Amino acid sequence: MITDEKKDERLSIILEPGQIEASAVTPPFLHLPAANLFELRAARLEQLAEGNALGDYLRLIARLCRIQQQLVDNPPGGMPVAEARQRLCMDHGLPPLAADSLVREGPWLVWLQALLEHLSGETRGPMGEALQVLRGSDDNQRKGWGIALLAGQYDGVPAALVPFLGAALQAAWSSWLLALPAHQLKPAGSLAQCPACGSPAMAGVVRNRGKHNGLRYLACSLCACEWHVVRVKCVYCESSKDLRYTSLEDDRHAPGKAPLRAECCPGCDSYLKQNYLENDAAAEPLADDLASLALDIRLDGEGFHRLAPNLMLAPGGG
């Protein structure tokens, strides 16, 4: 049986990737997150926690997601980027919510403080200890941790603090994204780079409804913006040669129907997880990524490298 990827692969032999992208109907470039993104994410995490070896951790992240939703619904701070600066960035094809600059400017720190206030009753156990470290830190220290986390410098951030820092950062940037005139966003310099904030993609999503049906979108690890990238192309080296698709061995679906598959590139030895909503309409990039760390372990053993961050978990911190 020919899988969806095999069909795409045969097509890519006939047409170059650029020709596929420039088809008669231009695909919608963006797919923005829902206003209740974090509520949906929490529900998915709770569903996936059942029977999962990391069930307790997934439930913790679900709890943080519900707090994230409360923060987005009642923002502790406003849009930090003036309209003139937004327009200037978008006119020049630059991300208006540039993470590398805003994380240093610090408007997200009030979001972290608000998150800590929601968790003020947590004082015991490993979680209480991690929160106490955050409560006892000043803005300069918190900012330094945030900078290190978004730069992927995990040795500069205590692993136990990552979910709380990541939750605050995600809530802030997702809220700002929803306040942007996003239709003016333009593709970034790299396929795997978010056009809204410049952060790396966390995973891919092959959508199954309406004008987005059958199209692949990459989901930002920070603001949750999704942008279109043609299928059967490595998002890191842009090669379409000899890509293979790997799923969990204990998945109950046939290989070509697995709802989560990793696109593995032998050219640069990288991989990217992808959710196929046709096979599981409830899939959610961050939740399904955390629930499938066994696939990361397997691919690491095969010599493939993960370049996509998940801000709710430090590598090796599971």
Swiss-Prot record:
This is Protein FdhE homolog. It is found in: Cytoplasm. It comes from Pseudomonas putida (strain ATCC 47054 / DSM 6125 / CFBP 8728 / NCIMB 11950 / KT2440). One of its GO terms (biological process) is protein maturation. Belongs to the FdhE family. InterPro entries: FdhE-like_sf, FdhE_C, FdhE_central, FdhE_N, Formate_DH_accessory. It comes from the Bacteria. SUPFAM superfamilies: FdhE-like (SSF144020). HAMAP family: FdeH. The keyword Metal-binding does not apply. Necessary for formate dehydrogenase activity. One of its GO terms (cellular component) is cytosol. Keywords: Cytoplasm. The keyword Ribonucleoprotein does not apply. One of its GO terms (molecular function) is ferric iron binding.
